[in-house]
C-alpha cells in the first residue's frame, strides 16, 4: 500500500489527501495520530473510502520500519514543512515519494512528483497521474544524491568550509 506518515494535524493537509484519493483504486494508510484523527476518520467514511483508506495510529518504531519496508510509495501532502524527516526515511528505503513543494521536498524529488502546497486540485492531479507510475520510479539516484548531500560527512565538510571562510574573513 501507499503510506502517508506524520502527526494528524491541520498543517499536514491529510483532509486534502483523503479528498484527492476519490478516484484512486490503490490502498492508502495514513499512519499517525493527533487532533485531526476523528475528523479524518469521519471524512473517510463520508466519502465512502473506508475500503481504500485506513488510519493507523500508535505504531512503535519497529512497526513503522515494517511499513516502510512494504510501502509502494509515500505521500507528503503538507502545506508547510521543515524537512520532513519522513522524506529522508522513505528515500533511504528507496520508496518513491510524491509531495508538496515545501521544505526540502523540491530539492530532492523530481518536479513531476510535486504538487502545490494547500492546493487540493493540484494534489489530486498529481495523485491521479503519478500513483499508477509509482512502481516505475527509480529512487536509487535520489538516494545517492541524498547520501552525498545530507550525510554526516557532508554536513561536517560544509560546516568546516563555513568556519574556514569565516576565519579567512576575520584575518
Question: Where is each model-derived feature located?
Answer:
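Short alpha-helical donor nucleotide-sugar binding micro-motif in glycosyltransferases
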Residues: 58-59, 66-71
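A short hydrophobic beta-strand element within the catalytic core of glycosyltransferases
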Residues: 74-75
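Aromatic "clamp/platform" in nucleotide-sugar-dependent glycosyltransferases that forms part
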Residues: 79
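Conserved acidic donor-binding segment of nucleotide-sugar-dependent glycosyltransferases
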Residues: 112-121, 128-135
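A charged, aromatic-enriched C-terminal amphipathic alpha-helix characteristic of glycosyltransferases
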Residues: 135-170
